[in-house]
Each structure stands twice: as C-alpha cells, then as structure tokens.
Amino acid sequence: MIEFINIQNFKTLLNASFPLGNLNLFSGLNGMGKSTLVQSLLLLRQSYERNTLKTKGLLLNGDYVNIGTGKDALSSFSEQEEIIFTVKWREKEQPTRFEFDYQHDSDLLPLRKSGIDGDSESLSLFNSNFQYLCADRLGPQSHHQLSEFHIRDLKSLGHYGEFAVHFIAVNRAKDLEIDALRHPMAVSGTLLANIEAWMSDITPGLKINAVAQPQFNSASLSYSFNQGKETTEEFKPQNVGFGLSYVLPVVTSILSAAKGDLLIIENPESHLHPAGQSLMGKLCAIAANNGVQLIVESHSDHFLNGIRVAVKQKVVAADDVKVFFLQRDVHSSIHASEVMYPNIDDEGRIDCWPEGFFDQWDKELDRLL
C-alpha cells in the first residue's frame, strides 16, 4: 500500500505531497492538477511494464497515459530541469525515489536514480493487484472484447472497462474475496449475485446477462429486470440507462478486489442519479475498510457525502479516508497548483471548506433564499 507520494516539477505540481490512506478522494476545479497525481502513478507503472523504469527512464507515452514529450511533462516554472517522484510504501522501510532528467523533445526521460529492486513485484502498483479505470469508459454496447490474458493473468477489466463483461462471464460464480462487500439482499456470495444486488440499488430489480462468445471473439451483454415473480425479456444496453453500463466496470472492480489491491478510478459516480452517486461512496468505503486502497477523482458532492455518512456509521475509520483539494492562485505569477487537506472527523464532519470545494449547492441555496 502506498503511504505517501511527493511530486516535484511534474506539470502543475512544483512540489506537492500526498499522505495517502485507504480511501483517497481528489477534488478541485477543472485543470487544477487532480489527474496529475494519477498520471504520475500510471507513468511509473507503464515504465515498469515496458522495462524502462529500472535502467532507462520514464516512458511518457504508453498503454496507460500519453503525456507527450519532456516539454509537456516538466512544470512551466520549474527552476530545475528534472522530475522527481518519491513514494513511500508500507511494505518498505525507506521511501523510494525516482529521479529523471529533462529532455525537451523526447518521450523517454533519462533515468538518474531509481529505487526499484527485486522486491518491486510485491508492490500493488507494479503487479496484478492493480486496476485502473479511466473517465473515458465505454458506454452501452451489446458486444465487448474478449481477452483471456487480461482477465485471467492480469485480472484486469481494461482501462476503459472493455473486458468487464468477459470478466463477469468467466468469474460470475466465484465467491467475493471480501465478505464485507456482500450486499445484504444478494442471493449468494458470488460475484454476479452481488453485482446485481448493488446495482439494483441504482436500478431496481436489475439482472445482468454476460456471456462469453469465443466463436465470435466477443462477449455479449444484456439486461433484464425482476418483475414480481417473473423476469422481463432481455434488453440491449443501448435501450437501458446509460449510467448502468458506464458504472458496471466500477462496481465489478470493487467487488472483485482483494485485500492489498490498488484501484485507481476516475469519476466512479458519473451518469448516476444522486442516490447512486452516494452509494458508490459507500461501496468504496467498505472496500477501503477491508484493506483495498482506492485513489479516486470526483467532482460529486453526493459521492463525498456517501463517504462522510460511511465514516459516521463506522463503515470506515475516519483516519483511513484522505481528501485532497487542488487549487491555483490565478493572481500568482507562477502557474502551479497547491494542495489543501480537508479532514473528515469521526462524525463525518469536514474541518475546512476552501472556496470551490463542493460548495456550489450552498452558493445556489443562498441565491434561492
């Protein structure tokens, strides 16, 4: 588990520190640097997978993220031509420091120093106990990609959730790794039963029909609904609410997680109604309380409030939840973001509310009164 990361001279972060917990929520106005922390971790992983991190350097473009070249990666107002990531893992006594030299037109920043050693495979950022779901996830589709390698060897749903349906089809009957994630209304402890139960809190009575079709090199998805003692006909995803298909990989990734896993999820609540957004906050909190580390980017006050309620109800300890708010002083001569650390107490209360931090409802309410 990652306990701490410091980022120097990368994009809008000149020198920013993030003490992480089990559940980490990144917020802020658009363009303030929320994604920069996520990108730093993805850069390390894609460089590790391409075997450049130990001996060559930081690969800026790859399977996880595409930054461009050195001029796109280096902070505009950096006084040093270097990018440094310092990561403290719970599994290691000392922080690991990654130093890279600047090259203006190269997409591989030369390695100056790397703390990667033989134990790196045990770290969730570098092994198969990792899941990343980007904001640009797939919407409703009847047919999805197959990949035995991704779902069995990597245990990956794909960055866009493109293998989620295949994953469900293959693992539908497997029991959850974390029993606390079992929904109280689930008919069993299996993955599919619990995906259906949690998502029925978003759309009542939902049934998921995921079938692998290797003869067509695809996996099919359709939905049906409980209607009294009967079940409706199957419906194409295109004819059911957009949010269901968009959130399906998110729910699947959380319910299939095990203790020690690292999940990075962008906008897990998008396209859901407010109650569904709050539910996603609760689901993340349950996973975090059982040893899963989640790094989440969100603009949703409902998602935040779902986490706050979970803290108050003792679903997750307040100390295991970290909130980061990124902002930038438009009057400053330096184009760089600063990080603020609103704290959630045991009652779910937040100790500070910076301007722009989930405060739009209060502003609109003031105008209405």
For each feature predicted by the language model, list its residue ranges.
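Phosphate-coordinating catalytic segments in nucleotide- and nucleic-acid-processing enzymes
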Residues: 47-249, 253, 258, 340-369
